[in-house]
């Protein structure tokens, strides 16, 4: 089954601020995740059903939540890993 990718409004604003090359890298990885979004090594502790996509070279992270009953990958936050900013943002938005 293929999951549909949807963005939270605030995550979409962050996405649109990204350089096009970063967006393309994330889009490629999101497409791959849409087939199987449950990647054990990418699971985030403390955030229910949340996973990350890493772009190691640029230091960007994308946090998404899997909603299985609706077949949706909801992008929660996009940003730099520095000081765990993107993870803290995702945690706040999941409350």
Identify the function of each model-found stretch.
Residues 2-4, 13-17, 55-60, 65-95:
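Enriched for short, Lys/Arg-rich terminal
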Residues 4, 27, 41, 50-52, ...:
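Generic N-terminal leader/processing signal
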Residues 10, 49, 80:
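Residues that form or immediately flank small-molecule/cofactor binding pockets and catalytic motifs
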Residues 31-55:
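A short, surface-exposed loop/turn module that caps and links secondary-structure elements
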């Amino acid at each position: 089954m293929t999951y549909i990718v949807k963005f939270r409004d605030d995550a979409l604003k962050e996405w649109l601020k990204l350089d096009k090359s970063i967006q393309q890298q994330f889009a490629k990885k999101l497409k791959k995740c849409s087939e199987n979004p449950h990647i054990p090594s990418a699971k985030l502790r403390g955030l229910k059903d949340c996973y990350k996509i890493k772009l190691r070279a640029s230091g960007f992270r994308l946090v998404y939540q899997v909603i299985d009953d609706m077949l949706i990958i909801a992008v929660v936050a996009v940003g730099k890993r520095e000081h765990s900013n993107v993870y803290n943002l995702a945690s706040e938005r999941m409350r």
